[in-house]
């Protein structure tokens, strides 16, 4: 054979001239078919098969194929990558009887010649799924002179293939285009080790001698578990391999043991400058001490042999009977060879010295070599003129004048074992009292090709998907047996699993610590985060994510199995205390014994509240729905207290069908500010005109009208005409659109500025009640109702000036000249202001903003954040300040509890005493129960004209709910003025 070839190409070419089916059944990548090749002349030669595997260093020329160059004393493999620019790589060519001649073998990492399984058209296997790409390459070279067939394995342990795998991981090819996380990346590398073990199993099944190459001078202990894994895998798949070669023309013992003999394993270590022998410091260089019998390299060799043998005996990789072992080592021969390192560590300097030596050839030498050399002769001349040795370049033996035993060369080391094979003596490596002879067979080239092809089909090149064929079935069974390797190879995962399994109970304890019997999702997540912190402190390795997911599942199962608290929150932001339950249906009774139980929500929180008019108080449960909060509680008290009082009812939904449907949760957004400004510019308001919306507009008949909330702050201020001190009744502007409320769909919540158009709720959350005539309120004693803190039950006076004109001033125009003997009206009124005005020019109303806390304590406020406190016979402060300001919806209660948590009181009622006078008091409540973008809530009838001579009570909603959920009361450290009743709640209009 003139050059190295891919083992797959070699077996394909041999199968062609043997008349059997090709392993892959496809032409070679080199471009020609193997079927046309003649029979090689060495087909009947008895051959010795030597397999080479191991790791390579990062240094130049440390690849394993340099070893074959040294042993064969010729340039079989190229010294450097891409030596010839037009080299197509190893392929099969029929020239001078060669089965596979290569013009120059390419680097093992390249894809030419069937280099990588699953990466090219011709591959060493067909496992091409994402993450299972095999980076192992088997190359073959037959030396006809020495009758030795070299099989060279380049795998993930070599730099070129390792670099390809790392690039695949980095680019995402191994993960289907995505970057793999730690656990999947670890699984990728372990899978590559398993595929490498299949290639090693093949070498251990077809070779007589195996060379393990290592780039350092210390033994890698990980080979111990690799060999134990291979031994276990071989015992597992041995029946399958027997089936594969049962028809091959080999001996009975070969068919029985699936190998020509127990292979002998030899070790090659590289020094790489690590071993340096220097004379002692005090020794005279002229009179050195007597040298020892063995050189330092020989002593290192013996030490490594003893260490390796002891390790393999302890782990029972080597036993007394060699026939039962994966491999053997000789008892009376050297099986470790130390390859000396180069004196020149700098690869660039080494190349420059090589170039310089070739450029300075002497004349006598040029006569000996008259023409340019190439091929093997060129390699020998390079060796003779080389000043520096390559990594595997070994000098010939020579005598030593110092008396030390001379170290043999690499070829001499290997050939003492090869000769035992070629002479058919075999290996007698069994030890002990009763050693059993091991089988041995020296096959011919043709017989070896026959057996090697069958094993190659099922172990490496077989297609697992082809289950219909015997080869595909055997391949499937062999690949399923790879799981045997996990206990040996995946030590990291095994350690990680043990570590994570020990961390799980600690994480479970951290999760269950200080837990109530039932708890919410928020508590579950907090406890799970604490458990994950404890778990991450102790868990390590690739199994971390797997057991973290198991921790998630375990904690969720514990929580959902009888410990799950109802997630529903009341309208006051309190959790339901029941465990997970369902609500009773219409007409169904609660059943606590069912699974899940049928119960109403209950937070076990109770408060005290007053009825619509405020005269009667009663305890109330914490509400969970808007109807119970704003309607049901007050309806129960209505029967006992307020039922006989006069009411102003707000419009509600009146169905026209027996089964009305709630409206969908689609909010009508408020218009932008620019549109609202344009609307104001187009329709200027006259003095005293109402800024509130009529009932038709409040039902959503105009989108622009909904954008006016909150009211324009410029409309307020200190102008008394705006807030009702004196206003002249003018003609109202007409509605934009006349539209009736829907009688098919109802509003499921409360009416607010973002509600859909034309919808009404089924019940009103507001109430307007008349307690009695205006004289029923005593200015000196205040309101006589339950729950008021002493001194806070008074209403504030509101003096409204009624403009009355005398008969002689009726036709007077302020813009015209005054008549003779008539005074200017402005001046006359200024003169008469002090004493001449009549008593009916001023009407006195009374206003009170009542706040109520959860304990039923009530008090009035005379302004924002100012609790009323009357010490004498009535309040002296006017109601103008409160009417001209945004009143807070919540305020700190005047009587705080003992706890640190602040106690809030809520604005619940507005008391208005309307005098019997020629004026109208219009009620326009607007509440914003939260910071923006919280909408503005208002009653179903926005402008309510209060009849004269009455004491009226407007009861505000207890809770505010939108389609997105309830507007909860404020928490600690929250600006209370973000929760407010907008200014302009009352307006007086003179008649």
UniProtKB/Swiss-Prot annotation:
Signal peptide: none annotated. Residues 279-289, 675-684 have a biased composition (Basic and acidic residues). Involved in nonsense-mediated decay (NMD) of mRNAs containing premature stop codons. Is recruited by release factors to stalled ribosomes together with SMG1 and SMG9 (forming the SMG1C protein kinase complex) and, in the SMG1C complex, is required to mediate the recruitment of SMG1 to the ribosome:SURF complex and to suppress SMG1 kinase activity until the ribosome:SURF complex locates the exon junction complex (EJC). Acts as a regulator of kinase activity. GO terms for cellular component: cytosol. Residues 290-299 have a biased composition (Basic residues). Phosphorylated by SMG1. The modification Omega-N-methylarginine is found at residue 898. Component of the SMG1C complex composed of SMG1, SMG8 and SMG9; the recruitment of SMG8 to SMG1 N-terminus induces a large conformational change in the SMG1 C-terminal head domain containing the catalytic domain. Forms heterodimers with SMG9; this assembly form may represent a SMG1C intermediate form. Belongs to the SMG8 family. The gene is SMG8. Residues 16-41, 82-127, 279-299, 653-722 are annotated as: Disordered. It is linked to Alzahrani-Kuwahara syndrome: An autosomal recessive disorder characterized by severe global developmental delay, impaired intellectual function, poor or absent speech, microcephaly, and facial dysmorphism. Additional variable features include early-onset cataracts, hypotonia, lower limb spasticity, and congenital heart malformations. This is Nonsense-mediated mRNA decay factor SMG8. Keywords: Cataract, Disease variant, Intellectual disability, Methylation, Nonsense-mediated mRNA decay, Phosphoprotein.
């Amino acid at each position: 054979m003139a050059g190295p070839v891919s083992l797959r190409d070699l077996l394909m070419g041999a199968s062609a001239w043997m008349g059997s089916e090709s392993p892959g059944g496809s032409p070679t990548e080199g471009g020609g078919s193997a079927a046309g090749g003649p029979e090689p002349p060495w087909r009947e030669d008895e051959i010795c098969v030597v397999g080479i595997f191991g790791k390579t260093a990062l240094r130049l020329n440390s690849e394993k194929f340099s070893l074959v160059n040294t042993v064969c004393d010729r340039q079989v493999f190229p010294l450097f990558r891409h030596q010839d620019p037009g080299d197509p790589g190893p392929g099969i060519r029929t020239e001078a009887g060669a089965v596979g001649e290569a013009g120059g073998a390419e680097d093992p990492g390249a894809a030419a010649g069937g280099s990588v399984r699953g990466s090219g058209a011709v591959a060493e296997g067909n496992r091409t799924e994402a993450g299972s790409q095999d980076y192992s390459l088997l190359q073959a070279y037959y030396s006809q002179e020495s009758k030795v067939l070299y099989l060279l394995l380049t795998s993930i342990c070599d730099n070129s293939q390792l670099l390809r795998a790392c690039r695949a991981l980095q680019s995402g090819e191994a993960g289907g285009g995505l970057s793999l996380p730690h656990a999947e990346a670890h699984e990728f590398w372990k899978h590559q080790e398993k595929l490498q073990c299949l290639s090693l199993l093949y070498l251990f099944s077809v070779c007589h001698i195996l060379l393990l190459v290592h780039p350092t001078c210390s033994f890698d202990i990980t080979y111990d578990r690799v060999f134990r894994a291979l031994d276990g895998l071989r015992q597992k798949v041995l029946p399958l391999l027997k089936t594969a070669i049962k028809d091959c023309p080999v001996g009975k013992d070969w068919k029985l043991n699936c190998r020509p003999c127990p292979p002998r394993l030899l070790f090659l270590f590289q020094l790489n400058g690590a071993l340096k022998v220097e004379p002692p410091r005090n020794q005279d260089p002229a009179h050195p001490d007597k040298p020892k019998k063995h050189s330092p390299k020989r002593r290192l060799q013996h030490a490594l042999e003893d260490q390796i043998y002891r390790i393999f005996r302890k782990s029972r990789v080597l036993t007394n009977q060699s026939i039962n072992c994966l491999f053997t080592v000789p008892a009376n021969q050297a099986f470790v060879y130390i390859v000396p390192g180069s004196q020149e560590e700098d690869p660039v300097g080494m190349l420059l010295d090589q170039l310089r030596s070739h450029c300075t050839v002497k004349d006598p030498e040029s006569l000996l070599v008259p023409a340019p050399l190439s091929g093997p002769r060129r390699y020998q001349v390079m060796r003779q003129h080389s000043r520096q040795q390559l990594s595997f370049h070994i000098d010939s033996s020579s005598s030593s004048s110092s008396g030390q035993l001379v170290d043999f060369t690499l070829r001499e080391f290997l050939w003492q074992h090869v000769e035992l094979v070629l002479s058919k003596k075999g290996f007698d490596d069994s030890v002990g009292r009763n050693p059993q002879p091991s089988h041995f067979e020296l096959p011919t080239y043709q017989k070896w090709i026959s057996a090697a092809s069958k094993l190659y089909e099922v172990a490496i090149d077989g297609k697992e998907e082809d289950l219909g064929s015997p080869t595909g079935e055997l391949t499937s069974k062999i690949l399923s047996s790879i799981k045997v390797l996990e206990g040996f190879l995946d030590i990291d995962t095994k350690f990680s699993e043990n570590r994570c399994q020990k961390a799980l109970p600690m994480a479970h304890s951290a999760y269950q610590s200080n837990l109530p019997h039932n708890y919410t999702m928020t508590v579950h997540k907090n406890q799970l985060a604490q458990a994950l912190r404890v778990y991450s402190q102790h868990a390590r390795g690739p199994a971390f994510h797997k057991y973290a997911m198991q921790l998630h599942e375990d904690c969720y199962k514990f929580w959902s199995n009888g410990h799950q608290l109802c997630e529903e929150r009341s309208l006051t932001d309190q959790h339901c205390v029941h465990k997970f339950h369902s609500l009773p249906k219409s007409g169904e009774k609660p059943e606590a014994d069912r699974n899940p139980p049928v119960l109403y929500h209950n937070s076990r929180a109770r408060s005290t509240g007053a009825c619509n008019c405020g005269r009667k108080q009663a305890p109330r449960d914490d509400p969970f729905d808007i109807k119970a909060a704003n309607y049901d509680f007050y309806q129960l008290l209505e029967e006992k207290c307020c039922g006989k009082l006069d009411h102003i009812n707000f419009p509600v939904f009146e169905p026209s069908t027996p089964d009305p449907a709630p409206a969908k949760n689609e909010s009508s957004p408020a218009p932008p500010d620019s549109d609202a400004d344009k609307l104001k510019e187009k329709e200027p308001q006259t003095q005293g005109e109402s800024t509130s919306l009529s009932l038709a507009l409040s039902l959503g008949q105009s989108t622009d009208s909904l954008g006016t909330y909150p009211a324009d702050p410029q409309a307020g201020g200190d102008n008394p005409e705006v807030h009702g001190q004196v206003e002249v009744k003018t003609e109202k502007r007409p509605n934009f659109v006349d539209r009736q409320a829907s009688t098919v769909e109802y509003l499921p919540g409360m009416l607010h500025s973002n509600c859909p158009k034309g919808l009404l709720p089924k019940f009103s959350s507001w109430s307007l009640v008349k307690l009695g005539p205006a004289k029923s309120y005593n200015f000196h004693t205040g309101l006589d109702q339950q729950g008021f803190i002493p001194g806070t039950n008074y209403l504030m006076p509101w003096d409204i000036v009624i403009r009355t004109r005398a008969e002689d001033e009726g036709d007077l125009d302020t813009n015209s000249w005054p008549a003779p003997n008539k005074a200017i009206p402005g001046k006359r009124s200024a003169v008469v202001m002090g004493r001449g005005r009549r008593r009916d020019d001023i009407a006195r109303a009374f206003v009170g903003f009542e706040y109520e806390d959860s304990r039923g304590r009530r008090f009035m406020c005379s302004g924002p954040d100012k609790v009323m406190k009357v010490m004498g016979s009535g309040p002296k402060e006017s109601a103008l300040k409160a009417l001209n300001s945004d009143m807070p919806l919540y305020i700190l209660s005047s009587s705080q509890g003992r706890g640190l948590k602040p106690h809030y009181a809520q604005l619940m009622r507005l008391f208005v005493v309307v005098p019997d006078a020629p004026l109208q008091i219009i009620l326009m409540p607007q509440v914003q129960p939260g910071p923006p973008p919280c909408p503005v809530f208002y009653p179903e009838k926005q402008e309510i004209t209060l009849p004269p001579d009455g004491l009226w009570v407007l009861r505000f909603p207890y809770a505010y709910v939108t389609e997105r959920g309830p507007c909860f009361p404020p928490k600690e450290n929250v600006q209370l003025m973000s929760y407010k009743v907008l200014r302009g709640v009352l307006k007086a209009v003179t008649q």
